[in-house]
Each structure stands twice: as C-alpha cells, then as structure tokens.
C-alpha cells in the first residue's frame, strides 16, 4: 500500500497547526501509518489462510472466520486513519484557499495604488535659517514617505515567535481549526469504542463456532495469537495517546485565547492607544500647545529710539490693563519706591525729548519745553491717579 499521497497532505497540515497539533501529526505518521503499513500487514497477512477449524464441512470454516473477525484488524485501522485524517485534510484545503485569496486581494490593492505614501513629521530647516535668530523652534511639517520604504522598515524588525496559535488566529482560521479538532476527537472516541466491541483486549488462541452450515460446535484455531494481542494493545495505546493530544490541544487553545485577551486588556490599561488622525496636507506648523511669537519689525535707529520704545511699552501696559484688569494682591509692597523710580524714568525721558528738540529746532526751545512740561505734568497726574487707584502699570 502506498501512503505517499496522504503523507504529503499531512505535511502541509504541519505548516498550519499548533505545537500540540504537530506532535499529534508525528504520532499519526510514525505510530499509526508506519506501524499499520509495515507491522500490521506482515503480522496479519496469513490471518485467514492459517485460520483452521476441526471440520471437513464445506463452507463451515469461512462462516466461522466471518464470525470471529467481521472486519479485519488491518482494514479497521486503515479505515480509522483515513477518517481521523479527513477533518485535518479538509481544514488544510480551506486554509490554503483562504490564504491564497487573502494574498490575491492584497496584491490587487498594491497594484491599484501605484506609489502609496505614508506621512511622517519632519523639521523644516529652511524656516530656521530665514529667522536669523539662531534659535531652534519645533517647526514641523508632514513629509511623504514611500510605502516600500515603510515595508522594508517593518520587515527589518524581528517578529515575535509563537507556536502557530497566533498565526491561525491572524489568518482567521481559528473557528474551522477548532471544528476539525472536535471532529477528530469524536472519530477517535468512536473508533476506540468500536475496536473494543469488535476485538476486545485479547486475541484468543481458539474460537468456538456453532453457525450453520457447521453440523455442531467446532473449535477453530488462530495463528500467532500472542503477537496479535501485543499489536492490538499497541494500537489501543496509540489511539488513547492521540485522544489525549486532542484534549491537550483544545485546552491549549482555550487557555491561550484567555491569556491573550487578558494581556490585551492589560496593555490597553497600561498604554492608551494612539489617536489616528485623518490624512490632511497642511502647511508647516508648530506642534499643538506651542505659542509662536511673531518677530517684530526692525526699528530704524534714531536718537529717540529709547523714547519710542518706552512709549510703545506704556501703550502695551495700558492695553493689558484694559483687557485683564488688575488685582490688589499683585501690587508691590513698597509703593513709594515704585513712584520714585517712575519719576526718575520720567525725568530722563523729558531730558531726552528736550535735547532732541533743541537740536532740530534751536529757535523754539521754550515753546517745546512748555509743551513737554505740560505733557509731563499730565503724565505725572495720571501716574499718581493710577497709583492711588491700585493699578499696576509701570511707565518707563
């Protein structure tokens, strides 16, 4: 008998099964197929020819052999191997078809998009050079990356090793795998019970037959009963071992699935998932939460640069007070020191303005001085009024 075809099919099952399933496959090939093909046929080849009965009645010996062995041991075990391996072969065909279909679908998707891109953020160096402030700002912009480069990066990363269970689950074959495992277990139990009712646990050395056309009870003798009994017990042990492996594999799948679900929940609690933002092409921008300060225009240098800067600062302070208001808890402790510093700053500002007008208009210094004096008086009165009201603006 040639077993090469079935052996090649079972080798393909080896590539789509768990660690326990591979052990079961080894037991099936080594102990069942090899023992049945080599040992069984050599032991039972003379089973009917050496079955001798003490009668000369024609046809009585054949009828007694049929009563002794309704089904030959070797044919029973061959039938058992075929039926037990059938669910695995059907699972293999389904798995190959589904995996090929998935690969074909992925190939069509890759062909549909010629050069897909993946977006990643990168810093724009040209923007930094144009600012001329020699400061690193986290200006980011989305950069397109070829999908092939992304796949090469993913392939370079080592994948975690597993025993085949995760691969079966990722391919969507877990349900059909469990179904074929249950069918295989049912066949094992059925053949184990049938073997017990057909042959028992021992091959007796003689058999008493009383069937027609035998004239009376006759004794029939079996060749090599001890050898056949040992081989029968070995096949019982192999069947029981395969049944235990099936139960072990079911427990392995059950506990493994529970462990994976618990680990996934733990990872979700420890590491919150990243947010998936839709792809949009945006102009270079700063990350969220980063305050961008616009660089002010350059002020041409003049003799009144300090005065203009002070005027702009005072204007900004007034605008800030109008927007946010002021609170009494932010007032400085020493108001007299603050007023003294304000008067000194105002005097320096008056001197600078007088010097500027004296250089540009030497004929009318008195009129300008009078205007400046009136202006400074109004400013001092406004300062004193604001200080008395509890405001926190500072004039420079």
From Swiss-Prot:
Residues 145-165, 357-396 are annotated as: Disordered. GO terms for molecular function: gap junction channel activity; gap junction channel activity involved in AV node cell-bundle of His cell electrical coupling; monoatomic ion channel activity. It holds the Pfam family Connexin. Residues 373-396 have a biased composition (Low complexity). Residues 303-358 form a coiled coil. Residues 40-75, 199-229 are extracellular. Residues 147-156 have a biased composition (Basic and acidic residues). Signal peptide: none annotated. SMART domains: CNX, Connexin_CCC. Belongs to the connexin family. Gamma-type subfamily. This is Gap junction gamma-1 protein. It comes from Rattus norvegicus. The gene is Gjc1.
């Amino acid at each position: 008998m040639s077993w090469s075809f079935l052996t090649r099919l079972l080798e393909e099952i080896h590539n789509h099964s768990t660690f326990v399933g591979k052990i079961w496959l080894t037991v099936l090939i080594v102990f069942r197929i090899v023992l049945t093909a080599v040992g069984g046929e050599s032991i039972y080849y003379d089973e009917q020819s050496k079955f001798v009965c003490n009668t000369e009645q024609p046809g009585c010996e054949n009828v007694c052999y049929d009563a002794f062995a309704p089904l030959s041991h070797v044919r029973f075990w061959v039938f058992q191997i075929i039926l037990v391996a059938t669910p695995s072969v059907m699972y293999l065909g389904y798995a190959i078809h589904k995996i090929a279909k998935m690969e074909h679908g992925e190939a069509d998707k890759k062909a549909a998009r010629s050069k897909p891109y993946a977006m990643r953020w990168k810093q724009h160096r040209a923007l930094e050079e144009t600012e001329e402030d020699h400061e690193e700002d986290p200006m980011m912009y989305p950069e397109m990356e070829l999908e092939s480069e992304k796949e090469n990066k993913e392939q370079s990363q080592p994948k975690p090793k597993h025993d085949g269970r995760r691969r079966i689950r990722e391919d969507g074959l877990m349900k059909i795998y469990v179904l074929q495992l249950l069918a295989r277990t049912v066949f094992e139990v059925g053949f184990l019970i049938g073997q017990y009712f057909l042959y028992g646990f021992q091959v007796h050395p003689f058999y008493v037959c009383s069937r027609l056309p035998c004239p009376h009870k006759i004794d029939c003798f079996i060749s090599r009963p001890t050898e056949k009994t040992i081989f029968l017990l070995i096949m019982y042990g192999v069947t029981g071992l395969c049944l235990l492996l099936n139960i072990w594999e079911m427990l392995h799948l059950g506990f493994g699935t529970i462990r994976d679900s618990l680990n996934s929940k733990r990872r979700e609690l420890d590491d919150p998932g990243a947010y998936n933002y839709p792809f949009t092409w945006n102009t270079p921008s700063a990350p969220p939460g980063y305050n961008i300060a616009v660089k002010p225009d350059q002020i041409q240098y003049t003799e009144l640069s300090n005065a203009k800067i002070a005027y702009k600062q005072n204007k900004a302070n007034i605008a800030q007070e109008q927007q946010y208001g002021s609170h009494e808890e932010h007032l400085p402790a020493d108001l007299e020191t603050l007023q003294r510093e304000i008067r000194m700053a105002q005097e320096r500002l008056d001197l600078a303005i007088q010097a500027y007008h004296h250089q540009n208009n030497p004929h009318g210094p008195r009129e300008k001085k009078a205007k400046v004096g009136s202006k400074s008086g109004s400013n001092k009165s406004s300062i004193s009024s604001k200080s008395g009201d509890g405001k926190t603006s500072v004039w420079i």
